[in-house]
Swiss-Prot record:
Residues 1-90 form the ATP-cone domain. One of its GO terms (molecular function) is ATP binding. The gene is pgk2. It catalyses: (2R)-2-phosphoglycerate + ATP = (2R)-2,3-bisphosphoglycerate + ADP + H(+). This is 2-phosphoglycerate kinase. The keyword ATP-binding applies. The keyword Nucleotide-binding applies. Belongs to the 2-phosphoglycerate kinase family. InterPro entries: 2PKG (IPR020872), ATP-cone_dom (IPR005144), P-loop_NTPase (IPR027417). Its cofactor is a divalent metal cation. Keywords: ATP-binding, Kinase, Nucleotide-binding, Transferase. Its EC number is 2.7.2.16.
């Protein structure tokens, strides 16, 4: 039996080599599952041929990378990027923001899956919890959608100000308290998590949190209004969808105004703005950005997979 040796908090451990675990890590680099398992079987055969009984994770990764570079350089690059992120000592907190309909939920799910992050939460869920705790009288804005929050304003703003954005900012300020609580808890517990939603707006989450090296924020945009509107038609035609298309279309003008505001906030605060047209391209952009700005290297304390 081939044993793989790793290290956790300075203590070494060994576990049996698993083709399934290795294959799963390869699928995170976008290798087809069947092909990944076949490749993992070849790695196992290679180790047996060389009569390897014990191998460190680092040595195994080097062998896998060498074989990948010969077979598929593109997958090899993605695999090494994934490995680099996995080696981060601290929990990884990824924040993905953007106006309704730009695809934050879909991208968050794919990014979490690619990185092997088990925890993901929508800011809409955080807002829903807050609704159960705080009454409508105290925080009327959170009982509205992000694009209708202006309707809850008790005092109408001056004509020269944009009431949609004033309502939206009030809405985001309230929900950001819940978002900050989730981030703080994840950091305390050492849990990696992806948080997505319209309430992830640069400038609204405490700087001491977003400036941490292991916290990364991204904003998604869709410049073409017709493409953006088409996303709502696509979303609402699903059988499980419960959100009425008519409501989105009726307030599309407000959604686009919020879209521009979030994008401007991102550029103002130096947050990466990603045009979300192609899912694969968007995910690759996020992964590459993480390796450049967030991951500083070093073995992750709880690393236990190939």
């Amino acid at each position: 039996m081939i044993m793989v040796q790793g290290e956790v908090s300075g203590k070494k451990y060994t576990e049996p080599f698993s083709k399934g675990v290795l294959a799963r890590s390869l699928t995170r680099a976008e290798m087809d599952p069947n092909r990944a398992y076949t490749f993992a079987s070849r790695i196992e055969a290679h180790l047996k041929k060389n009569k390897v009984d014990l191998i460190t994770i680092e040595e195994l990764v080097e062998i896998v990378s060498e074989h990948l570079r010969k077979e598929d350089p593109e997958v090899a690059e993605k695999y090494m990027l994934w490995r680099k992120i996995r080696q981060c000592k601290e929990p990884l907190i990824i924040l993905i923001g953007g106006a309704s309909g730009v695809g934050t939920s879909s991208i968050a799910f794919e990014v979490a899956n690619r990185l092997g992050i088990r925890n993901m939460i929508s800011t809409d869920m955080i807002r829903e919890v807050m609704r159960k705790i705080v009454s409508r009288e105290l925080l009327p804005s959170i009982y509205e959608s992000s694009y209708t929050a202006y309707q809850s304003l008790r005092i109408p703003p001056p004509p020269e100000l944009d009431e949609v954005l004033i309502g939206f900012r009030d809405h985001v300020e309230s929900v950001s308290i819940g978002v900050e609580a989730v981030i703080e808890r994840a950091l305390t517990e050492g849990i990696s998590i992806v948080i997505e939603g319209v309430h992830i707006v640069p400038g609204f989450i405490r700087e001491d949190l977003v400036n941490k090296e292991n916290v990364a924020m991204f904003v998604l945009t869709v410049s073409d209004e017709n493409v953006h509107k088409g996303r709502f038609y696509s979303r609402c035609r699903q059988m499980w969808a419960r959100r009425p298309l008519k409501r989105y279309i009726s307030y599309f003008w407000a959604i686009r105004r919020i879209h521009r505001y979030i994008e401007n906030q991102a550029r103002k605060h130096g947050v990466p703005v990603i045009e979300n047209i192609d899912v694969v391209t968007t995910i690759d952009s996020i992964i590459k950005s993480l390796t450049k700005t967030t991951v500083k290297g070093g073995e992750k304390g709880a690393e236990k997979t190939e």
